[in-house]
Structure formats: C-alpha cells, structure tokens
Amino acid sequence: MGQDSDASSELPLRIGLFGGTFDPPHRGHIAVAADVADALDLDRVLWIPAGHPPHKLLADTAPLALRVEMTRAVISADSRFKMTGIEAERMGPSYTVETAQALKENYPGAKLFLIIGTDQFRQLHLWKNPEKLLSLVELVVMDRDGQRGRDHTPHLAGTENAHFVPVRKIDISSTDVRIAVNDGQNVTTLIPSAVAEIIVREGLYRN
C-alpha cells in the first residue's frame, strides 16, 4: 500500500478526501462520493481507510488489511476514485489534520476538499487543530436525510467557506451490511460483488 501514482506524475487540481472505516464500503459510499465529485467538479476522490482513528473504537471491525482490500475493490466504480493507504500505514492514532498536511505535500499545488457529514461538521471544533486543518482544506459537508450542515456551523474561522452539497439519500449503512451478511441474506444490492467476494472468502461479519 502506498500513495497512488498520481502524486508523482499527473497532478489533479481538485482532490476530494473521503475518509471512513469502510467496514465494509458499500453502494451508498460510492453514490455520495460520486455526487460530491459531480457537484464540485473534482478530478479525484481519494478514499482513505481509517487506520486508528482517535475517536472511534475499532475492536470489532474487520482487520485493517481487509478493510483496505475492500476499499481498493470499490474504487473501480468510478474513474475519479483512487485509494491511499496513508492512514492505514501510520502507527498510532490517525488525525485528519496530519493526513491533510501529508497529502498537501504529496500533491503540491492541488486544492484539497475534505468530505464530511453533518454530524462530523457539528463536532469539528473537537478535532485536533481544527484551525490548521481548515487552512489546508476546503470543507465539503454532505447534506442528506433532511439534515442541513449550514444549520449547525461551528464557531471556527474558515467554516464560513464550507461547501454544502446535497447528496442522494441511500438507505444503506455498513451496519446494515454486516447484519445482512450475518443473517445469510443476499447483499448484492448493498455492496459491489468484488466486496462480497472478499467477505465470503474471509468469513467476515459472521458471529
């Protein structure tokens, strides 16, 4: 796992940063990433599987290597999608500000857009060095399920320039997928076949 090859060759001007546990990645993730890319004319959307996020317990998640493999399997859905193992390769907690700083160095001259949900937007003031983060990226807040990010703007300099992007309402969550797999249900409408194959091969999400 390493940085995708675009970092050393072609330099996309507009790059979305799409982080998540991706346990597993599903069709909802694919849909909203494409919606944001369309809305903001992004050249790339970098999918960033979380390694050791400081605010989330990962004791019951699939092994990191398999989450990375599943994420790599979904990026073929759109030519704008790439994956980076930047957080997966980092020892210790992964802070978004450190990821953004590293990607800023890897993609000199590129404009970075951090894609988050409304819940994350509300909590942004609790993140590590949020002011520095906002100096490195432009925020993209996904409005979905009737939630409007602009109604919950935290008091931080830089948030006034956030992009609020309506995305499709997709009634799929990673929890739904895990439950369906454990119950022996057909999950082809929830996840790409390549992800399903990894889940079956590894016996994931079965109690």
Language-model segments: residues:
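Nucleotidyltransferase catalytic core that binds NTPs
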Residues: 1-207
